[in-house]
């Protein structure tokens, strides 16, 4: 094999691997940011979406374009079910409460969405004593460099996304019981991920 043919072959194989990885990552969608079809025993349950709630909720607010957004800590996440508060179909409510939320994180979520074109007319901030705990700022699942992953394509090619995609398939194939699932409204429940 000549060096020219080897280079062509290498480029072709590399391109194929990138395309396959791209398609695989979108199909599995471990963080529920692409809102594609959920297939039982493949990608229906998304257990890693809870641990990437900062990304998941950010993309979901942009996708769902709610009128009302709840922000706060896990008290908001566990305590406010938007399905119970939604009075009509035109009023979309989304729970953007996150585990170990703090004023800094609430500010980030609010600032991030009010700078973009959106339908948000009301923001409800849930407060509790732990919300003002300064130790929460250093939680490893919230990084101030999260802006890197605002681009979905960059996120697709991250190593953690690949591992979480494989774990999502493993979880669904083994019919593992997923106790913590973020539903379409951002509320933490144990029912499983509803269809969008």
PLM regions and their residue ranges:
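N-terminal secretory signal peptides that target proteins for export/translocation
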Residues: 1-2
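Hydrophobic membrane-insertion alpha-helices, especially the h-region
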Residues: 5-29
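Short acidic/polar alpha-helix capping motifs at helix-coil junctions
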Residues: 20-23, 42-50, 75-76
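A broad, low-specificity signal for short, low-complexity segments enriched in glycine/proline
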Residues: 25-34, 53-57, 83-88
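Alpha-helical transmembrane signal-anchor/signal-peptide segments
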Residues: 28-49
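Short extracytoplasmic
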Residues: 44-71
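Membrane-embedded segments
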Residues: 64, 70-159
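Secreted/periplasmic serine-hydrolase-like ester/acetyl group-modifying domain
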Residues: 127, 138-196
